[in-house]
Amino acid sequence: MAVYQYAEQFTQFLAQKYEKELCSDALMHSNPQITFLNAQTIKLPRLTLSGYKDHTRTAGFNAGTISNDWEPKKLAHDRDIEFFVDPMDIDETNLALSVANIQNVFETEQAIPEKDCYNFSKLHTGLTNFHGSIDSTTVLTAQNILTVFDEEMSKMDDAGVPVDGRILYVTPTVNKLLKAADGIQRMITVNSSNAVNRNVHSLDDVTIKMVQSGRMKTKYNFTDGCVAAADADQINFILVHPSCVVARDKYAYISLFTPGTDSRTADGYLYQNRNYWDLFLIERKVAGCAMHVTKH
């Protein structure tokens, strides 16, 4: 009878898988200096300083003012699941591989898509609450897509959002518009096998990441897995700099209880998985995120 802690054994595998398959992975690593205040709360520093004053060339300097406080954010997305596995369905001599297969399928079909759905919808919630830039009136076409993009880029430039590191998340439909956009210049490459690559990987040094449209809704129902809410709107693109976001995985737990470990396992295996995380848009950096949304 044993309990295997697979979260430790599969740490590298999961990290590589998430980096490859989680579209919003870059947002999960932003602002590493922000720490947890307690088990459920992270604290966002808010530092305000006064500006220069005229120097009088007499002894002493002008006194400035400094204000330092914290904006607490409580993590709320705490998810878990368990599966009972009959011993006839698992080869005990290859236990790790069997659990890895369960984990791989669950992460691919459930956990990773849900994390993207939650993260992108949470960005929309933050933009709505902080009155950020959400365009829900312009109909995107190949003729105006670059103009809409340039307008959002200009707003960020004017607000002092860093140029380096901006990411443009787009649905396949918007990605298709970018390929056909009026005024866009591309270098078309032909490799040794005569395959033609027409992909647009960046725009004005902004990295483009294509995301399934099902993962870019404004609202989801998380009662049983993750499904788009009936009144959800479609997010078409998100232009964001990761510095305006704080996202944290607080707790990850993956265990397998062997037969007879406790009364629930009986003669079978019990697989448990828990993930506790959240994402927050920083109010003072709301200019670092913009969206285009189509109403349902």
Predicted regions and their residues:
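Internal, well-folded beta-alpha domain core
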Residues: K122-V139, D150, S154-K155, A159-D182, ...
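Glycine-rich loop at the start of a catalytic domain that most often binds anionic cofactors/ligands
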Residues: R57-F61
